From Swiss-Prot:
Residues carrying a glycan: N141, N295, N433
Signal peptide stretch: 1-27
The keyword Endoplasmic reticulum appears for this protein: yes
Disulfide bonds, paired cysteine numbers: none
GO MF entries: glucuronosyltransferase activity
Enzyme class: transferase
UniProt subcellular location: Microsome; Endoplasmic reticulum membrane
Taxonomic classification: Eukaryota, Metazoa, Chordata, Craniata, Vertebrata
One cellular-component annotation, GO: endoplasmic reticulum membrane
Encoding gene per record: Ugt1a2
Similarity field: Belongs to the UDP-glycosyltransferase family.
Record's protein name: UDP-glucuronosyltransferase 1-2
Membrane topology: Single-pass membrane protein
Length: 533
């Protein structure tokens, strides 16, 4: 009997092939230990996408967290922190306030060193509070997570992954002393790869290479002081002596928030993946408020001004200098600022507590971007093709600014020393000199010419690690070598010993031959002369 449900055999075969071609997916469990600030924004996008693909995500943060809030696409777990929320915020803000103080180089260096140590002390105490919470650790251990996603600048996640024997994926911009290259066994020659905080390019003269080497040694010393608490904690948990390099080398994949449009070309390892621009999302329509600001700017357009999520207030004197400079340009300026309103603020400058930075940068009327040179802001500027005036404040921001300036896509100002004239001239330069717009558009084109979006690439590698229970096949054998084996010093010594031995034997043979040939004649002549006498 014909029921009308007959399907041609060819159709069934096609359906089966289609089903077989679909990627096999099973919801996995992801534990996330994020870092505060803009670092969380990138990780948050990855977490959201993992949730959309059916994975369960638990985000572990301290109870005094400032930026990490509970959302519907992950479960937020908090742990006790040895500071109150007010003390925690004060610790962070006090270091930021120091960036606006003019100091002698030596004093600034020691204060920066102290700030780095305070930063590590703050988070190492947080790590101790977390890892000594036996009940929480037992809960995490019994939850059978498939992967830990963490930023190794807060090494607690790496220590926890090593302790629980869970595959780890790191997402980061960089670490303070190049320890990421030791942990991945990635070559890092100081001859053409500038170290963090040096503000050097990849083309260095002799004195700059000396400076680069000295910076490396100083950062190594600071790092040694700063990471000791984590090494002690890891050794206590694992019940054996362990270095932080060994703990970090446990990572299956390293996701670096950079690419070679911004960063200088360098060697990489198989488990190093570059996801620069992961925060560049599709431009959304502006709200009525901001659309009105943009439309009112007329033919001159707008300038977007933001110093990032960590800085929204600056000293009054400096704010007035900035306000004076902004009032001299014809563009409308949208300035994210929550401090006291400068008394000389011009009519063309609008203060806002928050602004949709990426959406504004993507608007065709945006002429320039004043930024602190954080990697998120830099990449949003690159993605949207907006030339920049950069005011780096701390950390890798100086290096990011140097890279963009080297590529002719922006102008860098020293926020401590600049005057209103300096800022005015910088803005007019990047707006009126067409080469800056052309260079940033070229960088934007290079950055966007890729086979896969950075967010999809990041999620792929997280799922890859979960599917295969890690990625040990990407781990180089260099991890198993001693320092002298890595540099082949034992081989060089062995070959040198052979060469020296051969040279010694040849020398002895020649000396023996000479004695036989010439020494005998000399004795005969001497004997003959004696007989004559």
């Amino acid at each position: 009997m014909d029921t009308g449900l007959c399907v041609p055999l060819r159709g069934i075969s096609g359906l089966l092939l289609l089903l077989c071609a679909l990627p096999w997916a099973e919801g996995a469990k992801v534990l996330v230990l994020p870092m505060e600030g803009s670092q969380w924004l990138s990780m948050r996008d990855v977490v959201r996408e993992l949730h959309a693909r059916g994975h369960q995500t638990v985000v572990l943060a301290s109870e005094v967290t400032v930026h990490i809030k509970g959302e519907d696409f992950f479960t937020l777990k908090t742990y006790a922190f040895p500071y109150t929320k007010e003390e925690y915020q004060q610790e962070i803000l006090s270091d930021i306030e120091k960036t606006f103080k003019t100091q002698h180089f030596v004093k600034a260096f020691f204060e920066t060193t102290a700030s780095i140590r305070n930063f590590f002390d703050l988070y190492s105490n947080s790590c101790i509070a977390l890892l000594h919470n036996k009940m929480l650790i037992q809960q995490l251990n019994s939850s059978f997570f498939d992967v830990i996603l963490t930023d190794p600048i807060f090494p607690c996640g790496a220590v926890l992954a090593k302790y629980l024997q869970i595959p780890a994926v790191f997402i980061l911009r960089s670490l303070s002393c190049g320890i990421e290259y030791e942990a991945t066994q990635c070559p890092n020659p100081s001859s053409y790869i500038p170290n963090l905080l040096t503000r050097l390019s990849d083309h260095m003269d002799f004195l700059q290479r000396v400076q680069n080497m000295l910076y490396y040694l100083v950062l190594k010393y600071i790092c040694r002081l700063s990471i000791t608490p984590y090494e002690s904690l890891a050794s206590e948990l694992l019940q054996r002596e362990v270095s932080l390099v060994e703990v970090l080398s446990h990572a299956s994949v390293w996701l670096f928030r950079g690419d070679f449009v911004l960063d200088y070309p360098r060697p990489i390892m198989p488990n190093m993946v570059f996801i620069g621009g992961i925060n560049c999302v599709t431009k959304k329509p502006l709200s009525q408020e901001f659309e009105a600001y943009v439309n009112a700017s007329g033919e001159h357009g707008i300038v977007v001004f933001s110093l990032g999520s960590m800085v929204s207030e600056i000293p009054e004197k400096k704010a007035m200098e900035i306000a004076e400079a902004l009032g001299r340009i014809p563009q409308t300026v949208l300035w994210r600022y929550t401090g006291t309103r400068p008394s000389n603020l011009a009519k063309n400058t609008i203060l806002v507590k928050w602004l949709p930075q990426n959406d504004l940068l993507g608007h065709p009327k945006t002429r320039a971007f004043i930024t602190h040179s954080g990697s998120h802001g830099i990449y949003e500027g690159i993605c949207n093709g907006v030339p920049m005036v950069m005011m780096p404040l701390f950390g890798d921001q100086m290096d990011n600014a140097k890279r963009m300036e080297t590529r002719g896509a922006g102008v860098t100002l020293n926020v401590l020393e600049m005057t209103a004239d300096d800022l005015e001239n910088a803005l007019k330069t990047v707006i009126n000199n067409k080469s800056y717009k052309e260079n940033i558009m070229r960088l934007s084109s290079l950055h966007k010419d890729r086979p896969i979006e950075p967010l999809d690439l990041a999620v792929f590698w997280v799922e890859y690690v979960m599917r295969h229970k890690g990625a040990p096949h990407l781990r180089p054998a260099a991890h198993d070598l001693t320092w002298y084996q890595y540099h082949s010093l034992d081989v060089i010594g062995f070959l040198l010993a052979i060469v020296l031995t051969v040279v010694f034997i040849v020398f002895k043979c020649c000396a023996y031959g000479c004695r036989k040939c010439f020494g005998g004649k000399g004795r005969v002549k001497k004997s003959h002369k004696s007989k004559t006498h």
